[in-house]
């Protein structure tokens, strides 16, 4: 066991899906995996291991934000030997051509957080995805006919920003969408020499103010999860 994960050694697969919501982790396990076993309920942050098309895979809730996902990613890699970490979540679109329910593959992640500035002595670091996972996910999406967009996303520390226009400068530089975890995930993957990728479903648009319904989010989320599950090795 690690501090925040109750699993024993060997109970977590080398490839893991990381939704922020622990109930979404439970949904993925119960609806997509076979022979599932729950290895974690610590703090209500569910973790499951099962199989998908004969390949062993795990799914673990991470909570919201860079500090929370950093805890789970550190322990999954250091204590359980996870090699492929795939975040599946939602985001807000920053570009006019991006529609609700589109799927985004995060090639890289900018951030307004000071986490990496503290780590790198005030200098910037460019967190990037695993090219191997990125290419494979894109190819799978093409095969399944799922429209995907690939590019930079913005990882933010605050969900409710007092400056409602702060996103516009990022959009000017081509940033596709905003979310809250990817920069931390990619930085830690680089530190430990493992592979990581974020897949995001567009749940709302900062351009139009449009939002998806819970049913629409669920239906689109399932397509994204099907892409992510194909990355199991």
UniProtKB/Swiss-Prot annotation:
Active site (UniProt): 204 (proton donor)
Site note Important for catalytic activity, residues: 217
EC supergroup of this enzyme: transferase
Biological processes, Gene Ontology terms: purine nucleoside catabolic process
InterPro entries: DeoD-type (IPR004402), Nucleoside_phosphorylase_CS (IPR018016), Nucleoside_phosphorylase_d (IPR000845), Nucleoside_phosphorylase_sf (IPR035994)
Any one of the GO CC terms: cytosol
Annotated binding of a purine D-ribonucleoside, by residue: 4, 162, 179-181, 203-204
Keyword DNA damage: no
Keyword Nucleus: no
HAMAP family: Pur_nucleosid_phosp
Family: Belongs to the PNP/UDP phosphorylase family.
NCBIfam families according to UniProt: deoD (TIGR00107), PRK05819.1 (NF004489)
Subunit structure as annotated in this protein's UniProt entry: Homohexamer; trimer of homodimers.
Protein name as annotated: Purine nucleoside phosphorylase DeoD-type
Organism: Alkaliphilus metalliredigens (strain QYMF)
Native organism taxonomy: Bacteria, Bacillati, Bacillota, Clostridia, Peptostreptococcales
Primary gene name: deoD
């Amino acid at each position: 066991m690690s501090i925040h994960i109750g699993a024993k050694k060997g109970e977590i697969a080398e490839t893991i899906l990381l939704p922020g919501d622990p109930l979404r982790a439970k949904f993925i396990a119960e609806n997509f995996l076979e022979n599932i076993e729950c290895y974690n309920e610590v703090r209500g942050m569910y973790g499951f291991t099962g199989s998908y098309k004969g390949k062993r895979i795990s799914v673990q809730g991470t909570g919201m934000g860079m500090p929370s996902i950093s805890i789970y990613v550190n322990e999954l890699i250091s204590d359980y030997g996870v090699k492929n970490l795939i975040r599946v979540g939602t985001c807000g679109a920053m570009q006019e051509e991006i529609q609700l329910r589109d799927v985004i593959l995060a090639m890289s992640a900018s951030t307004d957080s000071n986490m990496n500035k503290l780590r790198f002595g005030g200098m910037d670091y460019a967190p990037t995805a695993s090219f191997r996972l990125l290419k494979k996910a894109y190819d799978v999406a093409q095969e399944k006919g799922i429209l995907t967009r690939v590019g930079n996303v913005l990882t933010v520390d605050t969900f409710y920003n007092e400056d409602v226009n702060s996103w516009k400068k990022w959009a000017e530089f081509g940033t596709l969408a905003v979310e809250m975890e990817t920069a931390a995930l990619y930085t830690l993957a680089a530190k430990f020499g493992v592979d990581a990728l974020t897949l995001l479903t567009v749940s709302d648009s900062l351009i139009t103010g449009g939002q998806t319904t819970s049913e629409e989010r669920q239906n689109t989320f399932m397509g994204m999860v099907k892409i992510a599950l194909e990355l199991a090795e």
